UniProtKB/Swiss-Prot annotation:
Name of the protein in question: Ribosomal RNA small subunit methyltransferase A
Source organism of this protein record: Thermus thermophilus (strain ATCC BAA-163 / DSM 7039 / HB27)
Family that this chain belongs to: Belongs to the class I-like SAM-binding methyltransferase superfamily. rRNA adenine N(6)-methyltransferase family. RsmA subfamily.
Broad class of enzyme this protein falls into: transferase
Entry-linked PROSITE patterns: RRNA_A_DIMETH (PS01131), SAM_RNA_A_N6_MT (PS51689)
Alphabetically ordered keywords of this record: Cytoplasm, Methyltransferase, RNA-binding, rRNA processing, S-adenosyl-L-methionine, Transferase
Length: 271
């Protein structure tokens, strides 16, 4: 078993370095050997370089390296440098101490992979940006269960919304398994989930997502009224809905991605 795979060993390591888990960085260190192995298996095959965001104390980093991955680990918390240099000593890892949101993701090699226990507060903006780059073959990451549900939701469900459609536009999304708070140290207040995204190669479409954001901007309203409130001519929206065979009182959460794409075509040039 890894020396980082128990709360006791992690606590001892932190105390030895005079450190603590910092909530500012969303630090909840994964201490479950079983779940570490399952994450590595979900990320295989390692057909390109692997980028890990938020390596923390290096448990997942070590597991990936031992499985043969070529890893670049990006950590914002400079306090963890001596810890990572200790726990990953002798292993061929590239450590980068930088804010992951400022990393030049558009320049990573084509076919790269993301494998990470993501700091929860940056998960949504980071994943959205990585998908837009078109550089990744696969993204496998831990997030709050609630965020995973939003990424993989079906139409007509409470979790379905803009994030669901952004992810679906760029990738096939899978929620693989859930992790209890006890799999981490310190334990978070919520469950987590492992998500795997397999990009489809679809380019970014700003016009589509202006429409989607307008549609969900007034979630309690009908789609017709929400779009009218956002500046779309009501008559054009009514006409486009009729052309799609949709009733005038349809709501945004009833439309899947393909329906939004067709609606966007019907509203071309409307705003």
């Amino acid at each position: 078993m890894s020396k980082l795979a128990s709360p006791q060993s992690v606590r001892a390591l932190l105390e030895r370095h005079g450190l603590f888990a910092d909530k500012r960085f969303g630090q909840n260190f994964l201490v479950s050997e079983v779940h570490l192995r399952r994450i590595v298996e979900a990320a295989r095959p390692f057909t390109g370089p692997v980028f890990e965001v938020g390596p923390g104390l290096g448990a997942l980093t070590r597991a990936l390296l031992e499985a043969g991955a070529e890893v670049t680990a990006i950590e914002k918390d400079l306090r963890l440098r001596p810890v990572l240099e200790e726990t990953l000593s002798g292993l061929p890892v590239r450590l980068v101490f930088q804010d992951a949101l400022l990393y030049p993701w558009e320049e990573v090699p084509q076919g790269s992979l993301l494998v990470a226990n993501l700091p929860y507060h940056i998960a949504t903006p980071l994943v959205t940006r990585l998908l837009k780059t078109g550089r990744f073959a696969r993204l496998v990451f831990l997030v709050q269960k609630e965020v995973a549900e939003r990424m993989t939701a079906r139409p007509k469900t409470p979790a379905y919304g803009v994030l669901t459609l952004r992810v679906a536009h760029h990738a096939v999304a899978e929620r693989l398994f859930d992790l209890p708070p006890g799999a981490f140290f310190p334990p978070p207040k919520v469950w987590s989930s492992l998500v795997r995204l397999t990009p489809t190669g679809a380019p970014d479409d700003p016009g589509l997502f202006r429409l989607v954001e307008a549609a969900f901007g007034k979630r309690r309203k009908t789609l017709l009224n929400a779009l009218a409130a956002a500046g779309y001519p009501k008559a054009r929206v009514e006409e486009a809905l009729r052309a799609l065979g949709l009733p005038p009182r349809v709501r945004a959460e009833e439309l899947d991605l393909e329906a939004f794409r067709r609606l966007r075509e019907g509203l071309e040039g409307a705003v």
